[in-house]
Amino acid sequence: MAQVAKKILVTCALPYANGSIHLGHMLEHIQADIWVRFQRMRGNQVHFICADDAHGTPIMLKAQQMGIEPEQMIAEMSQEHQQDFAGFAISYDNYHSTHSDENRELSSLIYGRLKANGYIKNRTISQLYDPEKGMFLPDRFVKGTCPKCKAPEQYGDNCEVCGATYSPTELIDPKSAVSGATPVMRESEHFFFDLPAFSDMLQAWTRSGALQEQVANKMQEWFDSGLQQWDITRDAPYFGFEVPDAPGKYFYVWLDAPIGYMGAFKNLCDKRGDLDFDEFWGKDAKTDLYHFIGKDIVYFHSLFWPAMLEGSNFRKPTNLFVHGYVTVNGAKMSKSRGTFIKAGTYLKYLDADCLRYYYAAKLSSRIDDIDLNLEDFVQRVNVDIVNKVVNLASRNAGFINKRFAGQLADQLADPVLYKTFTDAATSIADAYNNRESGKAIREIMALADVANRYVDEQAPWVVAKQEGRDADLHAICSMGINLFRVLMTYLKPVLPSLTERTEAFLNTELTWDSIEQPLLGHSITAFKALFNRIDLDKVNEMVASSKEDMAPATRVTGPLADDPIQETISFDDFAKVDMRIALIQQAEFVEGSDKLLKLTLELGGETRQIFSGIRSAYPDPKALEGRMTVMVANLAPRKMRFGVSEGMVIAAGPGGSDIFLLSPDSGAQPGMQVK
């Protein structure tokens, strides 16, 4: 019985419209595109959409700094984003914007339904207000002196030096990060989405078995700590959609951003005329809906988004496909090191298929971080794609073209071997379907080894010199070309550009179902180089270019210039500080904070709990476990919103991604005093 084609809608998270696409972003779009291309090869009807996330205070302020209207800025950024995605052959059917008529209408519709169903609550809150700019200030737009450690220039919600969390009103000498003015407290009525009302539904959805285990486990932690009502409005001035019948109130960007998935699809429906919006978004839709997202936005997509859809009588996602972060050479992407590489910069130097292949070879269905090791990247692409796959074609095509006028043999030299290759279609398809592209690549490369071993053993270059063996030569080389065809069919979802050149060379389309029948008596075209090796020097040029692109056009600064040495203290003052070697037993995220990590430290007979503001530099806290560090052990315990912090770990750096946890030399033991 023929398999019934599925109808599938696939989305990627919407890139924010105030910056360029970089190689970290590309992981998600490549992963999704590989899955989409595979589904299309299998005959499923897939609609693949995305859009720019184009609202919010950061966009409004950046446009002001540039001296242009936000609409102009987001239009220019959208053009750049679409050019980058096209350069990487991301096969979107539609790329739209959240700043659209469709999104405005759908946001108003969903809000209206939520309000009518009793899920919108009003209450008055107090916020800091910039009297010069005439705007309420989000926590991140207030800076001042930390009330705990007295570090200057700290954000309004968290100290990046000591890790303390607080409200903006607790800052010493707070200033607006927008104007520099001293903010004042003002009250404002805000609208809240009653997320706790959907707790039972969300827990049932979590336990349905569809979600990744890591996502379900994380959601259970949020349920255990209790869901809170969600503030969905912001006050003017704000770049976004005004709330209906509420002048001066705007939808918070995270309300209308996921609705952008619906808006982008509605726009596609209107363009095409043959798509039914309700077939994919209606309450009882039988189609599949999948969101590819990063682990940093699971909270919004696994709680708020399905609750919003449920409360407004729309369907929920079939599943969320969540991936980890990208590191480069084992560390966070760095502008100073040149590893913060823009997509556009990459495309100036290298073939997009190279990165697509490398990511595919490392991706699985788990939420694991992917390391783009640039030396390994060069070697893997050159060995796998060039040496194993493309070389298989070049080793055989020359003889076919020169000795047999481009005509393949009428019979298959080794039907049993060929069947081994085609039998692998089932397991490779299962791997692709389950987003285990790394597993698929491993199986494909194992077959490539077998194919090359066959050619090595048959030695067509030797046979070609022997009289009376033209038929053998023809059969061997035709077999090699047919094995190459099967391999490239399996790689088609990953390598679209190479596939296009391969189809032109083989003079046939590569389809999943056609590999059962080998190419016999078939004419191929003259062989031309299908793929170029990567030169490490080219990669180094790209890194150097990224350093130049990202270098600030300001005077050269350094740690001492940026952070001068403080006033001299006496030896007696210093002697009061008791620093100890500590072993990090456990490191984990702190729910409700995007700055803190919770560390459990072993001091050699005593265990301490510490909250440290180092999350921005260590996106995978598990990597810290088992590591030695230095802590201040006699600091008075500090009660924080998340618990009691019993000391402080020592780190260097200006903050953000450039925080470096100190470690002792080898031989140091937990509990040893630092003198």
Curated annotation (Swiss-Prot):
Q: List the disulfide bonds.
A: none
Q: Which cofactor does it need?
A: Zn(2+)
Record note on cofactor: Binds 1 zinc ion per subunit.
User: Which Pfam families has this protein been placed in?
Assistant: Anticodon_3, tRNA-synt_1g, tRNA_bind
Q: Where is the tRNA-binding domain?
A: 573-675
- Chain segments annotated as coiled-coil in the UniProt record: none
Q: Which GO terms describe its molecular function?
A: ATP binding; metal ion binding; methionine-tRNA ligase activity; tRNA binding
Residues given in the record as ATP binding sites: K335
Q: Which residues bind Zn(2+)?
A: C146, C149, C159, C162
One GO biological process term is: methionyl-tRNA aminoacylation
**Alphabetical list of InterPro entries matching this protein:** aa-tRNA-synth_I_CS, Anticodon_Met, Met-tRNA-synth_bsu_C, Met-tRNA_ligase_1, Met-tRNA_synth, Methionyl/Leucyl_tRNA_Synth, MetRS_core, MetRS_Zn
Q: Which UniProt keywords apply?
A: Aminoacyl-tRNA synthetase, ATP-binding, Cytoplasm, Ligase, Metal-binding, Nucleotide-binding, Protein biosynthesis, RNA-binding, tRNA-binding, Zinc
PANTHER family xrefs:
METHIONINE--TRNA LIGASE (PTHR45765), METHIONINE--TRNA LIGASE, CYTOPLASMIC (PTHR45765:SF1)
Protein name, as recorded: Methionine--tRNA ligase
Which organism is this entry from?
Answer: Yersinia pseudotuberculosis serotype O:3 (strain YPIII)
Q: What is the lineage of its organism?
A: Bacteria, Pseudomonadati, Pseudomonadota, Gammaproteobacteria, Enterobacterales
- Gene giving rise to this polypeptide: metG
